[in-house]
Amino acid sequence: MIRIGHGFDVHAFGEDRPLIIGGVEVPYHTGFIAHSDGDVALHALTDAILGAAALGDIGKLFPDTDMQYKNADSRGLLREAFRQVQEKGYKIGNVDITIIAQAPKMRPHIDAMRAKIAEDILCDIEQVNVKATTTEKLGFTGRQEGIACEAVALLIRQ
């Protein structure tokens, strides 16, 4: 059996902390306003794999009302979500992530993001694609108020 899931996440800029995207610290003058580390790419991916396995979403598994997830490392959240997906008998077919940001530029960091994601979801780096786009200065991402991300995940029954 093959299953597909879609995830989406958005975070606004505004906190004095590192900007983490795809598990990688991206140099920038501000970080995200978020309960966890705010990693939009890993949050979207976590939702995609949970959705594909019919396990709900990141908010169900790791509610932002629970202080144990305050400033949580999103790589740990992704690994736990994937562990639950594996328990249902699935492995990754492939994942595809689109980061939507006017700034900062993602290209220099994409290979590192792919490597960390592949490590976390126990697959080959060739099964992980990360790309970035802008909104041509339109909307909140175009005004550099934050970043959005979409992800899809294909799961295969083991």
From Swiss-Prot:
Homotrimer. It catalyses: 4-CDP-2-C-methyl-D-erythritol 2-phosphate = 2-C-methyl-D-erythritol 2,4-cyclic diphosphate + CMP. It is an enzyme of class 4 (lyase). This is 2-C-methyl-D-erythritol 2,4-cyclodiphosphate synthase. It comes from Haemophilus influenzae (strain 86-028NP). GO terms for biological process: isopentenyl diphosphate biosynthetic process, methylerythritol 4-phosphate pathway; terpenoid biosynthetic process. InterPro entries: MECDP_synthase, MECDP_synthase_CS, MECDP_synthase_sf. Belongs to the IspF family. PANTHER family: 2-C-METHYL-D-ERYTHRITOL 2,4-CYCLODIPHOSPHATE SYNTHASE, CHLOROPLASTIC. It comes from the Bacteria. Involved in the biosynthesis of isopentenyl diphosphate (IPP) and dimethylallyl diphosphate (DMAPP), two major building blocks of isoprenoid compounds. Catalyzes the conversion of 4-diphosphocytidyl-2-C-methyl-D-erythritol 2-phosphate (CDP-ME2P) to 2-C-methyl-D-erythritol 2,4-cyclodiphosphate (ME-CPP) with a corresponding release of cytidine 5-monophosphate (CMP). Binds 1 divalent metal cation per subunit. 4-CDP-2-C-methyl-D-erythritol 2-phosphate binds at residues 9-11, 35-36, 57-59, 62-66, 133-136, 140, 143. Keywords: Isoprene biosynthesis, Lyase, Metal-binding. A divalent metal cation binds at D9, H11, H43. GO terms for molecular function: 2-C-methyl-D-erythritol 2,4-cyclodiphosphate synthase activity; metal ion binding. Its cofactor is a divalent metal cation. Its EC number is 4.6.1.12.
